[in-house]
Amino acid sequence: MKNLKKALFLAFLGAGLIAPVQAEEVHMIMCGGEIREADQAVISAFEAKHSGVTVNAEAVPWGTCQDKSMTLAAAGDPVGLAYMGSRTLKQLARSGLIVPVDISDEQQGMYQPGILNTVSDGGKTWGFPHAFSTKALFINCGLVEEAGMACVAPKTWTGMYNMAKAINDNTAAAGVGVAAKDFDNTMHQFLNYLYSNGGSVNNAETGEITFNSPETVETLEFYGKLAGVAQEGPMGYERGQLTQLYNDGQIGMYINGPWGAGQHNDNIAEIVVPIPAGPSGESGTLLITDSIAVFKGSANEDLAMELASMLSSGEAQYDLDMSWGLTPIMQYEKMMDDVYYTTDYWKVFVDPIGSGGPEPMFEDFKALQAGINSAIQGIILGEGSAADLVAEAAETLAEGL
């Protein structure tokens, strides 16, 4: 009998019916369509540390990556981890699709003010913060001067509008780039103005919707007014598409993040200034993060958690922030002497961190986007008064909280 078992074993082995030990794979989705060098360096180090483990890092464009990650998880075939907008975390957590993460007290103390609030819900942390941005206004001085004005920072919405109108009326360019496409960063553009006018979307502690306010009505009215001196067809543009218009000299100014300077043509003489203040507020900015979530029930959940932690740890995170041109997500000056964000240019993006407003955390984040974008498109199309459109949007937001 013993010899029979041995013979059968050898027969199966010879026929190739006994599978070799399978190499382990960690599947990762990276929103944005590319794997950046800083992240790839960490992935390579992770694979070198774990012999036989490979990371399937799949780069997926922003337009589809979040839905893909969520659909796979809901279907019972989750990826190990995904880099995605932190706005998705509340829905993923409450649906039981991701697991909470542990960030050491030491690392928590390194983050910029407000960062951990963007990844927390119900007393738990649901993602490792991995990208952070604040915003500022980029102005093409050549077009401003061609329009007969001095290229100095407008401090108020009135000053910004007057500058944009002068460019629009006296040059071949539109005065300002306005985003109104049904896209997440259209909502983000609007929130930069809202937070510069003393407005808010909701009370983060109580959940009360505060969007229906005089400050929001003023902001929506101003957004519609800007559309009158903006590029043709704002509803066809999201923020990323405005960069090309700016490079082509077709718009005089637009709001972008600190990576903007690296995307702009060298021959553009520009200034970068704080977002002008509205009549009811002070200059502000949206504080927005993307993060790495670890999905529940993947084949190698522990490995996915380790990789997520490595990608977002001190030196690795610094390399990403510096090379990508991101607002520093951590207070790196506590870790090292020579940091990249000490210039006057970076001051415009770093100084507002303490007073900026967060991207709201809604369980139905698509309702948040739909409600705000509907109001933006409505004011541009003349479908109602700002007050009515804001009230309608607030009702949509209440359903998504």
Where are these regions (language model features)?
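Conserved C-terminal helix/tail region of periplasmic/extracytoplasmic solute-binding proteins
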Residues: 48, 145, 228, 351-401
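Glycine-centered hinge/linker elements that transmit conformational signals in sensory
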Residues: 163-166, 205-235
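Short, solvent-exposed loop/beta-turn-alpha elements that line the ligand-binding surface or hinge
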Residues: 99-113, 176-183, 197-218, 266, ...
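Hinge/lid segment of periplasmic solute-binding proteins
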Residues: 86-136, 158-161, 189, 269-273, ...
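Extracytoplasmic "Venus flytrap"/periplasmic binding protein-like
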Residues: 26, 45-113, 120, 146-148, ...
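Extracytoplasmic/periplasmic solute-binding protein
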Residues: 126-130, 135, 158-208, 251
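A structural signal for short loop-to-beta-strand junctions that line the ligand-binding cleft
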Residues: 79-80, 108-143, 174, 282-283, ...
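C-terminal lobe and pocket-closing loops
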Residues: 90, 258-271, 278-374
